[in-house]
Amino acid sequence: QPTYVSSRHYYLHMDTTAYGDFDFRNPRYHELQCWNVPGFIRIEAAPTFVELLEKLTAFLGRQPELPEWIYNGLIIGAQGGNERSFGIVDKSLEHGIKVSGLWCQDWCGKRVTSFGKRLQWDWHFHKEMYPDLPKHIEELHARGIKFLGYVNPYLVNDGELYAEGKKRGVFAKKADGSDYLVDFGEFYCGVVDFTNPEAYNWFKDEVIKKYTLDIGIDGWMADFGEYLPTDDLVLANGVSPMIEHNHWPVLWAKCNYDAVKESGKLGQVVYFMRAGGTGSQKYCTLLWAGDQSVDFSRHDGLCTVICAALSSGMVGCGLNHCDI
C-alpha cells in the first residue's frame, strides 16, 4: 500500500496499484517511485496522531467490529482430525482453560509432499479426517465454543471444486487460453479470477457460503492474496497483472466480506488475512502477522510482530494478531 505517516503529523497516499517504493534516506526530501502515473497524491495533516489516523481511516475505510466471543478465551489451533482436535478442547476445558474457539486449518484434509504435510486445497470438510463435522460444530456451539477453518483463493487441480470451476470457466488464463496453473510445491492450483464477476460470485456463493458458513463455521484464515503471477497470466478485465497484483488482496478481502455480509453474519464471523492493499481495511475483519519464528530473533521473532502491529495500525488495520 503506497502510504506513509510522517512524524510531522501528516500522511501521504499515492493512488496506484503499480509497483512503487519510497526512499526516506535523504533528510531534506523524500523520493517516491511508482511504475505508472498515479491517479492522485493525497496529503492530509492533523495536530495529533489520533486525529491524523481518524482522517486516514475515513479515507481508506475502517475494519468491521469484532464479535464479543473472540475476547472470551483461547482460540486453540489444532490439527489431525476429529479425535485429536476436539480431544484437545476437552483436555483444555478439564484443566480449567477458557476456550472460545477451535481452529482446524486441516478441516479440508491433508496432502503429503516430499517436504512435509500440506493442506488439501479443496475447500470443503474432509469426510475421512473430519466425519460429520457439521454435527461436531453444533456440539461445540452448544458449549459456547466456535469453530474456525482455512480457505485461500486457489483450487488444487485434482480436487472436486477445481473440476466444477473449470466447467464454469472461473480461472485466470495463460496467453494461449489454457488455465494458468501455479506450482505450489508438488501440486498445481488454478487462480480464481476475481475480476470475472461470474467467478467472483461463484467462489463467494458456492465455496465460502456453501461449504463454510452454511455448515456453521464461525471463521477462517483467509490466506494468501499476495501471489498473483505477473508473467503471462491473462485476467478477464484485461488489466495487466503487474497493475492488478497489488489490488488482488483487496478483491480477495472483499469476496470474504461480501459472503459474510450477505449471509447476515457480519459481526459474528471472523476471518483473518495476511495480505492487504489500499482499501482492504474495510473488508478485513482481522489482520494476521504471518508465520513468525517462535523466538526473540531480530528478523522474524517477537519484535517483528510488534513492528507489524504498529505499522499496520498506523494505516488503518489496528485489529491484528499473531501466532503464539
Feature roles, as predicted:
Residues 1-324:
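Catalytic-domain carbohydrate-binding cleft regions of carbohydrate-active enzymes
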